[in-house]
Amino acid sequence: MKMLFTSLLALIFAGNLLAADVAADFSAANRLYAEGKYSDAATAYKNILQTGWQSSAMLFNCANAEFKAGNLGKAIAAYRRAEHLSPRDSEIRANLAFVQNQVQGATIREDRWQGWLGQLTFNEWTLLAAGAFWLTFALLIARQIRPALMPRLRSVTRLTVALTVFSSAVLALQAANHFNSSVAVVTSAEATARSGPFDEAQSAFTARDGAELSVLDRHDNWIQVADGSGKIGWLPVKQVEVLPGA
């Protein structure tokens, strides 16, 4: 028990040291941004993110720095990751939309249905569906134990059943989008999509910095993508940042 307690104290102490280091690095990155050293600031933010310390604020600042440095694709990727963590943050959504409007060429756009689904995170939809299910289950048990309550609980039970069905259906859609779909954001000035996953293949189309493409397939260090106009081609992975479904 004493060894366990000592180990716990060591972990807490190490965690506090890590938090202090992150806070210091974050302040240093903010100073670089304030001084107009946007590329250096973006690198500093990314170094913190690579330690596993993820937050929407950190990603948002990183995205701002990337945009100021002229890196549209990297900015969009960081904004998208920040939006994934805080989907109802109006400032993140506004900045993302602003940068997306700077992108040239065909790019995929989020439709209204996806935008509505994105108002909650995948975990929040999961909690909503689970909460509705257990509330319905509790009401059904209460009706069995106390039959006299049945008339008063009938309407409420119908409502919770409807909520359970609806939230479960939405959760299924979110799960399909979250686990089965990906978006690739072009992070180079120009990326030539080819008809096959090799350099000698014929050019299919050209995507500009910041273009968002649907990921269709993968082969070695190549991904097959489709742009907003429906054109399909293969791009080297090094020219894009692949994001999971929202």
Predicted features, each with a name:
Residues 34, 186-215, 219-221, 239:
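Beta-loop motif signature
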Residues 72, 157-188, 195-198, 202, ...:
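Boundary regions of SH3-family modules and the immediately adjacent low-complexity/disordered segments
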Residues 105-145:
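Membrane-embedded alpha-helical segments of integral membrane proteins
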